[in-house]
Amino acid sequence: FWKTKHINNIFISTPSIIGIVYLILVMNQVFLIDLYLSDYVIIFISYSIIATVFFSMILGHWYLNVIQLPIKLLKNSIILLSFLLIIRLFWNIYALTTFELTDNYGINLSLFSFLWTFEGFLLLVAIFFGLIVPIILNVFIWYTLQIQSTQSATGLIYVSVVSLLFGDLFYKYYAFRFGIIV
């Protein structure tokens, strides 16, 4: 199966299709909640980032086993991931400069000020592991793909998966705990 000389698009596309179906199922549950349109967009972007990094990881594995795959496919998935991370970066900058919340002591704080409190520290961790580290890794992945080293790129994508999952875990904590969708 892995040693085949021909590319079977069904096996490459199936994980993506399953991911899209689950994304639609999750988004249907999210639409039951009364949120602003911008909140729905950033939730969709967040899930899309996770789906894209997993797709890139699976695609990277195919490059390890099927030599004939054009490297352009993996480059395109990394470009898409970079684009989604840039959107999240702009959203986080917007949120940090404009959002306010009330902490446990009843004090209104800007989100940027909240980062430097005891309760807000993990949001800083979420931004670091869920945004800054993946952006830096994407630069490394891109240059690794430029030298046609798909094995190294796949390893870096693995690190990006772990970083994004770790960051997303903390993002979700703040969404549930404080109602902050960042």
Region spans (language model):
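Hydrophobic alpha-helical membrane segments
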Residues: 128-141, 161
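Interfacial loop-to-transmembrane junctions
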Residues: 142-163
